[in-house]
Amino acid sequence: LMRALALEILRRKLSVTWWTNIRFEKSFSADLCLLLKASGCIAVSGGLEVASDRLLQLIDKGVTVEQVAKVTRNFTEAGIMVHAYLMYGYPTQTIQETVDSLEMVRQLFEVGVLQSGFWHQFAMTAHSPVGMYPEKFGVVKETETIGTFANNDINYVDKTGIDHDKFSFGLKKSLFNFMHGFCFDYKLQEWFDFKIPKTRIHPDFIANAIEEAEDFNIKPTAKIVWL
């Protein structure tokens, strides 16, 4: 759809500026990102969510952190800004996974493929997969009462017993600094006033991911567009 939109904008010789929400699909190749930029796309927002492959699979997001890194590289190299929706406190998420998620985010900003982001704490809604099948996610609903539209959050108990609230300030403070290009050399422990485990993520995980050459398979139906 976005490819078709970009081609139509160019065909009509329109002068527009646009920004959209996406999923970090692997179909966002370097060429497609250049086409989107030429049509007036200045930025995209997408859900990296918990920045953990296990939890992304549990959510059925359809992406991996490595794939997100490659796609954000393509957008950034095309001159399109990338904003990431980030999440913490997802059911079954461990303290280790929260720390590792922060490290993934730190690396994405450090290598320059992410320009903006915001941490959201997980909230259970009535008709989400967690709300409908809480037992699958290790949580217990405190009530079956469902509110009206846009007022359908449900209180729940996380069986892990982890207090995810306490991570809020450190996650947001670190992100604020990363967005401004500061403090990449800080140890993750410095963002929190309580003991956290060391990250298990390789320090060059994201750098190695974006250095891999893009799989340049041309489909028989591909078009050549001169920009």
Regions found by a protein language model. Name each.
Residues 153-227:
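Radical SAM enzyme core and accessory elements
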Residues 12, 39, 70-82, 108-113, ...:
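A structural motif corresponding to the C-terminal end of an alpha-helix
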